[in-house]
Amino acid sequence: MPLLATGKKFIRTIEQSGAVGIYVPSEGGFEGRYKRRLRATGYLTLFVSAPGMGDLASYFTDVHGVRPPHLGKNQIRTYFLPPFVTYQLENLPPQAKGLALWLYDGKRLAKQELAYLSAITASEPRLKVVVELGGARSFEWQPLSDIVAAA
């Protein structure tokens, strides 16, 4: 039985623009197929929740401090974490095409944060970003730069 949607246009759009905003049906299932096709193309994929990351620039490319919640009499501490994207790009397998960062619940991101995600892919060609921006009746996507320009 042949596949109805091969995902070649989706992969081509990601490779050309670097960052893509997607709209997925609320019943789910479609995004999983496209995630699988992205992995089959040769990208290492990471799935991250967009809300709660804080400053995207420091989270993705700088060593950043994280404070765990202060619960009672514990000492107030700060843990330092390595840069999320930079660390993953340095440790990519040699056969991988690049790193595909899939951010779900991206409708909570501000226009400035979406513009940063579009810009970081221009500075790092091995990084591709997919942001889930909301719901639609069918699986739809656009380059993130077009979405930022229209907003």
UniProtKB/Swiss-Prot annotation:
Name of the top EC class for this enzyme: translocase
EC number from the UniProt entry: 7.1.1.-
Location (main, coarse): membrane
InterPro entries: NAD(P)H-quinone_OxRdtase_su_N
Any Pfam family matching the protein: NdhN
Subcellular location: Cellular thylakoid membrane
Keyword Flavoprotein: no
Lipid bilayer topology: Peripheral membrane protein
Domain of life of the native organism: Bacteria
A cellular component annotation (GO) from this entry: plasma membrane-derived thylakoid membrane
Assigned protein family: Belongs to the complex I NdhN subunit family.
Record text on subunit structure and interactions: NDH-1 can be composed of about 15 different subunits; different subcomplexes with different compositions have been identified which probably have different functions.
Name the UniProt record assigns to this protein: NAD(P)H-quinone oxidoreductase subunit N
Organism in which the protein naturally occurs: Acaryochloris marina (strain MBIC 11017)
